[in-house]
Structure formats: structure tokens, C-alpha cells
Amino acid sequence: MRRAISHAKNGEWPISKAVDGVTLDYEARHRRRYRLRTHEGEDVLLDLAEAVAMADGDGLRLEDNSWLTVKAGQEDLIEITTDNPQHLARVAWHLGNRHLLAAINANRILIRPDHVIESMVVGLDARIRHVTEAFQPEHGAYHEHRDTPLSSAS
């Protein structure tokens, strides 16, 4: 089984050397070691030194210096919308207070399905809709930045 041994962000790897791709949901895009199935049906071992938060368009370098393209897979999600940005910010605060993964933009918030949270959001007079899309939530204030590795204190 071939091994994927390093990761590069979208735009920082030679896409012309892509020989195949993998479609991964959010959980599978944040792994260190994992068995992947490529679009062509090949099993590849993801074997990175550390877990990396991969995003759509990133690349995985194989041992032979060829590359796999990472595609964010479609997931069942809840789309939250409101009538104005202030109301959406208020809903975002409540979601953040519960430490939920959320993809936030100017017009909507995407979260994973959770009937308790859905009830809370409706109780805040926001609208919900079930959608199927790629999920790329915010990292949060204390995440490992993709461009600066964390040093470990021993």
C-alpha cells in the first residue's frame, strides 16, 4: 500500500503532479494516520508526522513524489439564517458558548445536525434548513495555525 507522507495547503503544491484524489468528510480531513480510498479505488495509507486540518484543494504527497488532491466531502448539515447580521451574530454567540463546530459567514452559519441545538436556534427566532454541503468549520482561537507549527514544552 502506498503512503501519503506530507500535506500542503491549497496553492502550495504542484497540482500538475496530482495522480488521483480523495474525498473526505470533516473528521477524515483531520487525521494523522488513516486508510484512504482514492477516487480510482486505490487504498493509500495517510501517514503524517502530526494530525493536520486539511481543507478542500489541499494536496497529499505520496512517497514517489506524486500527489493526491483533497476534496471536502458532502455532509448533512444544518443551515442557520436570520433577518439581519446582528441577529446572526447573536445566534453565533450562543453556538460558540456551547463550543460547537460552526462554519460562519456573513449570511449564514452551518453546523452539524443536533436536535437539541436546532430547538435552541429556533427558540432564538432563527431559521434552520437541512442541507448537504462540504463542512469547513472555523478553527477557533486556540487552534494550531496551519502556517506556524506549535512547539511542545517538555
Residue ranges and their predicted role:
Residues 1-51:
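Intrinsically disordered, low-complexity, positively charged segments
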Residues 1-18, 40, 111-154:
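Helix-rich terminal scaffold detector
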Residues 96-99, 103, 125-130:
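A common structural junction motif
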Residues 94-95, 105-106, 116, 123:
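Conserved "landmark" site that anchors the functional core of diverse proteins
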Residues 86, 90-97:
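Short, solvent-exposed interaction modules
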Residues 54, 60-62:
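Short, well-ordered loop/turn sites that connect or cap secondary structure elements
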Residues 36-38, 99, 104-106:
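Long beta-strand-rich cores associated with HINT superfamily self-processing modules
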Residues 68-82:
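Short glycine-/aliphatic-rich beta-strand segments at the starts of folded cytosolic domains
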